[in-house]
Amino acid sequence: MRFKQLDKITEMVPGERISAFRHVNADEDYLRDHFPLFPVMPGVLMLEALYQASCWLIRATEGFENSVLMLKEAKNVKFADFMEPNQTLLISAEILKLEQDTVLIKATGSKGETVAVSARLVIGKSNLASRNEDLESLDVFLRDFLAGQLAKLTS
């Protein structure tokens, strides 16, 4: 993940829900350009935070069964408020439907009691080895690496 959009996972109930947060620091690189006179967290990064939290929930739910989780669709995306420097995005996501190849997630990002972003996400699941058996060792590496990253986010 080039842009890690979660600082900490505060609660996780595998198979059900996750809560996490992302603090918008005043020195974030993107704030210089987005926007110079009114710096705010880009909406796409707010959506990315929802997606990343959702992926951790799926991984924990399935015991890191799949090495690759990809956003297939973002439905009903609503941006309702800005995230300015020194504000914290409180993220919550819940599993609505868990299928063999996809998961439907309902996610929101709030600042305090105000919803800033909400969406329903369709996330696809797979392993690299399902397309090329020679990549099975990479699947194992990725699952182990991601398990270590989750441990850091929950400690």
Model-inferred region functions:
Residues 15, 85, 96-155:
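HotDog/MaoC-like acyl-thioester-processing domains
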Residues 3-5, 89, 103:
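Hydrophobic core residues within well-ordered beta-strands of beta-rich domains
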Residues 21, 92, 106-108:
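Beta-strand residues in well-ordered beta-sheet regions across diverse protein folds
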Residues 1-41, 46:
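Catalytic strand-loop segment that frames the active site of acyl-thioester-processing enzymes
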